[in-house]
Amino acid sequence: MSKKTFEELFTELQHKAANGDPATSRTAELVDKGVHAIGKKVVEEAAEVWMAAEYEGKDAAAEEISQLLYHVQVMMVARGISLDDVYAHL
């Protein structure tokens, strides 16, 4: 599996949101559905991170965290929030 940086993933998601077909791109589909649908996925994935961290191993928790980060970045793309916008608050 190829590794991506947070920045590389964000750039890829921006491209998919702008150019992807919602019928074939999960990212484009989520952005098309809007902030409410994306928000539901963020909450779902956050709960899965918690459960994996508490009851499963390191690998399961890491996988769930990666899915949470994906959905958070999709939310950022949908709302027009840049990485620099977020970095300003770190």
Swiss-Prot record:
UniProt cross-references to InterPro entries, sorted A to Z: HisE, PRib-ATP_PPHydrolase-like
A GO term for molecular function: phosphoribosyl-ATP diphosphatase activity
UniProt keyword annotation of Signal present: no
Reaction catalyzed: 1-(5-phospho-beta-D-ribosyl)-ATP + H2O = 1-(5-phospho-beta-D-ribosyl)-5'-AMP + diphosphate + H(+)
Annotated GO biological process: L-histidine biosynthetic process
Listed pathway(s): Amino-acid biosynthesis; L-histidine biosynthesis; L-histidine from 5-phospho-alpha-D-ribose 1-diphosphate: step 2/9
Keywords, in A-Z order: Amino-acid biosynthesis, ATP-binding, Cytoplasm, Histidine biosynthesis, Hydrolase, Nucleotide-binding
One GO CC annotation: cytoplasm
Keyword Nucleotide-binding: yes
Any Pfam family matching the protein: PRA-PH
CDD domains the record matches: NTP-PPase_HisE (cd11547)
Primary location recorded for the protein, binned into one broad class: cytoplasm
Cell location: Cytoplasm
E.C. number: 3.6.1.31
Record-stated family: Belongs to the PRA-PH family.
Protein name in UniProt: Phosphoribosyl-ATP pyrophosphatase
Gene coding for it: hisE
